[in-house]
A protein has these predicted regions:
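Hydrophobic membrane-targeting segments
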Residues: 1-56
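Internal alpha-helical transmembrane segments of multi-pass membrane proteins, especially GPCRs
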Residues: 13, 17, 23, 129-139, ...
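Alpha-helical transmembrane segments
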Residues: 27-47, 146, 153, 188-203
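Predominantly long cytosolic amphipathic alpha-helical stalk/bundle segments
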Residues: 49-144, 155-167, 194-230
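Hydrophobic alpha-helical transmembrane segments and adjacent short intramembrane/lumenal linkers
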Residues: 164-178
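Hydrophobic alpha-helical transmembrane segments of polytopic membrane proteins
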Residues: 178-192
């Protein structure tokens, strides 16, 4: 008795059109997820390195005005990431309010802290970019795969109506085709959920470090503005 090989490609090629559409959707979701996983990993790694480098420079005793001016050059402007954007936003607003002749230290600090909060929110959004898509793929893909499996199994049993004697050899190919959809759903979901959890934790950790820096920088500016008033 000649049996057709049950290879993955053979099963996909012989699946129904709807099951093939489900498999194609899951394959595309998996590919897009991997692209986003690589991009997010590279971006967060770059943001972490930028934070460590800038923090070392900031606490090295460099004059704040000089540190701000270093970022004004064209070469450095394209490399500014993460915490340095928060520093620049706060120091720019602090300098602007001082140059306007504002004598109220609380008003100066309020404006400075507001500018840093806005910059912090933007950096947080950058860190969490594409995470919602990964979460969607992680949560929805298994159900899409299950839908393809259920549909494929229904077709397999429907085909038994035209068979005089149902055997395992008759049903197995159709069920195998259907189960490939579930496997592809898990293949798309598992990397997405692992990446989402890791990148969410990384984003939360970096955001906490950004917030800590903002508070420390605010304390430095607070001492400066009150020292100049006294």
């Amino acid at each position: 008795m000649n049996q057709e090989p049950l290879s993955i490609l053979h099963l996909i090629a012989n699946a129904s059109l709807l099951v093939q559409a489900v498999m194609l959707l899951l394959f595309l979701a998996s590919m897009v997820s991997w692209v986003m996983i690589v991009q997010r990993g590279l971006y967060q790694s770059k943001a972490r390195s930028a934070y460590n480098a800038f923090e070392s420079l900031f606490w090295s005793g460099t004059d704040l005005t000089q540190l701000y001016r270093q970022g004004n050059t064209e070469a450095n402007r394209n490399t500014i990431e993460g915490v340095e954007n928060i520093f620049r936003a706060g120091f720019k607003e602090y300098t602007r309010l001082r140059q306007q002749g504002s004598t109220d230290p609380d008003a100066i600090m309020e404006g400075t802290q507001r500018a840093m909060r806005v910059a912090l929110t933007r950096e947080e959004e950058k860190l969490e970019g594409n995470l919602s898509f990964l979460a969607s793929v992680a949560s929805v893909s298994p159900y899409i795969g299950l839908f393809g499996t259920v549909w494929g199994i229904m077709n397999s049993f429907r085909g038994l109506a035209n068979v005089h004697q149902a055997t395992l050899a008759t049903v197995a190919p159709g069920i195998s085709e259907a189960l490939v959809a579930t496997a592809m759903g898990l293949f798309a979901a598992i990397p997405a959920v692992l990446a989402y959890n890791r990148f969410s934790a990384n984003a939360e950790s970096l955001t906490t470090r950004y917030e800590t820096f903002s508070e420390e920088f605010s304390a430095i500016l607070h001492r400066q503005v009150h020292a100049k008033q006294s």
